[in-house]
Amino acid sequence: MQHPREENSIVVELEPALATFIKQGFNNLVKWPLLNIGVVLYNTSTAVNEEWLTAVEHIPTMKIFYKHIHKILTREMGFLVYLKRSQSEHDNYITLYDFDYYIIDKDTNSVTMVDKPTELKETLLHVFQEYRLKSSQTIELIAFSSGTVINEDIVSKLTFLDVEVFNREYNNVKTIIDPDFVSRSPFIVISPMGKLTFFVEVYSWFDFKSCFKDIIDFLEGTLIANIHNHMIKVGDCDETVSSYNPESGMLFVNDLMTMNIVNFFGCNSRLESYHRFDMTKVDVELFIKALSDACKKILSASNRL
């Protein structure tokens, strides 16, 4: 019988500067939103609202919204979770399966329920205190992925809850909700001496390799776009930006992209430092080809899981 969750690693050997570039790109660009826009609608449990919202914020939602990875990473889509659960004599706990899960199309604000794997019944979130007929505990809450804009249009789509209660409770907490995009990286990634390693979790109910490909394709496309948009100032060196003086051959490195690209072509640079280097050695298209080849190598390694 296949275990529902397995920890694995995907390892590829790359040129060290390129491996570092991919690792840093992953950590800075591949951002999976947390459920930090949370609203408790009704709570008679022994856990206070803040405890519920903290627990829900960090639900591992990628294993639920796995069919929508690319559009969530590009922020074309968001998601929400909704829980309404009462204690009973024979049902005294809450699992992730008790939530309903919805995808949000940010263009139309449409809200669509997604299927949830039965394996979520194995993930415990809360245990109620001893059941008493006259004081049964109930919790109702909703939480949106970070970056979701809460407006009248999207609220009107929440037909499964009492909109008046939602508006009242949301107005009570919206000033303390972090307005910044709050996220986490889907995996831990390291690259010691060019050994690029992804520490991943594989679940039995969906095709991890397809999901991992969505992530790497997103990363590659975003990195290539960033390379094309990257600029190095030419002229007198300016310590506020990466800059190169062709007359002296001096390069000032002030960002990670410049550092990794010039290191790929033989420089031994560090951030916020000067280096004598011939920038004519840098071939951006050659670097992009090496990046694309590395991404193919990563996907090939993932297919061996």
Swiss-Prot record:
Gene: OPG156
GO cellular component: DNA-directed RNA polymerase complex; virion component
Catalytic activity: RNA(n) + a ribonucleoside 5'-triphosphate = RNA(n+1) + diphosphate
Cross-referenced InterPro entries: DNA-dir_RNA_pol_35kDa_poxviral (IPR005059)
Subcellular location: Virion
EC number from the UniProt entry: 2.7.7.6
Principal localisation: virion
Subunit structure: The DNA-dependent RNA polymerase used for intermediate and late genes expression consists of eight subunits 147 kDa, 133 kDa, 35 kDa, 30 kDa, 22 kDa, 19 kDa, 18 kDa and 7 kDa totalling more than 500 kDa in mass. The same holoenzyme, with the addition of the transcription-specificity factor RAP94, is used for early gene expression.
Pfam family, one: Pox_RNA_pol_35
Biological classification of the source: Viruses, Varidnaviria, Bamfordvirae, Nucleocytoviricota, Pokkesviricetes
UniProt source species: Monkeypox virus
Protein's recorded name: DNA-directed RNA polymerase 35 kDa subunit
